[in-house]
Each structure stands twice: as structure tokens, then as C-alpha cells.
Amino acid sequence: MFIISFEGIDGSGKTTISKIIYEKLLIEIGSNKKIILTSEPFSQEIIKLIEEIGWKDPISLALLFTADRAYHLNLLFKQNPEIIIMDRYIDSTIAYQSSLGIDENWIRNLNKYFPEPDLTILLDLKPETAIARIKNKVDKFNFDEKISTLSKVREKYLELAKRNNKIRIVNAEKSIDEIVEETWSIVYSFLNHF
């Protein structure tokens, strides 16, 4: 089983790009492999709690995201997938909650029983661009997005990428077609090596 996660600050295009890559994988690989596209947070009950808490309690948020992940992965693994495409995963919890002052090692310990992604696509863009995109979205929940918050989260993501060679950075300031082309090249190359 391979896990490919899509990460980045809110507004970076994770949902759009992960869906397009999933569809390209279905066409390229065909139905002979079980490929699942999913996103976090998953449970509607936990999403409601997360929206209620907002940024006020980062410890509770980290615990809720981790509980959601445990529940979510349990359901996914029962389906015996060969490839899982994740719109957010462990690095999101690390980037967001550690930017709020929670110790990264504590977050990692909470998540140590979950499989690490085999490949992570980090869609990177400036917080100002992200804010402009978020303002145009009406279908996703988000907290009170601020440039200062997104800047801290972006810095944490870039720090994680420097420490982990499984994370590939894609410039999300480009057009969707360019982002898809670069991302597809990375994913396709990765899967061809296994």
C-alpha cells in the first residue's frame, strides 16, 4: 500500500490537485489497482467540534485531528487499498498545531502508530495568494484565516520539507495546468519506481 499525501496551507489547491491526480491515476493505472481518494478531517462529528473550538485550544485540536485520523484510517484499511491519495494527513497536524505553540515531538508521538506517507506533495504558495483564494471558497470550513497564521504554518511546512526527502515542493502560484503537470510528473515517477 502506498500513501500519497497532499499538504499545504489553506487555499493552496490540495483538494483540486489531489482530485485531478486521483482521476489521472485511475485512467493511467486502470481499475486493476484499488485507488482511494480521501481527505482529513473525515468525521462530520469531529469537524463540528473542530469548527466550534477554532484556534482557541490547539491541544484539543491536535487530539481531535488524531482521533479523526485513527477512525478514518481504520475504515480505509478495511478496504485493502493499494494506493491512498490523502488531502491532508499527519504533516497538516504538525504544521498547524506546532505553529500554535504545541511541541512537534508531542504531536509526532500522538501520530506514531499511523503509517507515514510514501510521498508528500507540498503545494506551496504565499499566504496573500492563499487568503485571496480562501475568500472565493464557500464550500470548505476554515478558521479565522490570517496572513500571520498562514505564514507560520507555511514556514513549518517548508521546514518539514527540508528534513524529509519524501516531501516534494510544488509551486502552487502557477496555473492549475502547470501545477498538475509538475505534480503528475512527480507522482508518476514515484509509482514507476515501485
Curated annotation (Swiss-Prot):
Its EC number is 2.7.4.9. One of its GO terms (cellular component) is cytoplasm. GO terms for biological process: dTDP biosynthetic process; dTTP biosynthetic process; dUDP biosynthetic process. It comes from the Archaea. It is an enzyme of class 2 (transferase). This is Probable thymidylate kinase. One of its GO terms (molecular function) is dTMP kinase activity. NCBIfam families: DTMP_kinase (TIGR00041). InterPro entries: P-loop_NTPase, Thymidylate_kin-like_dom, Thymidylate_kin_CS, Thymidylate_kinase. It catalyses: dTMP + ATP = dTDP + ADP. Belongs to the thymidylate kinase family. HAMAP family: Thymidylate_kinase (MF_00165). ATP binds at G8, I9, D10, G11, S12, G13, K14, T15. Keywords: ATP-binding, Kinase, Nucleotide biosynthesis, Nucleotide-binding, Transferase. The gene is tmk.
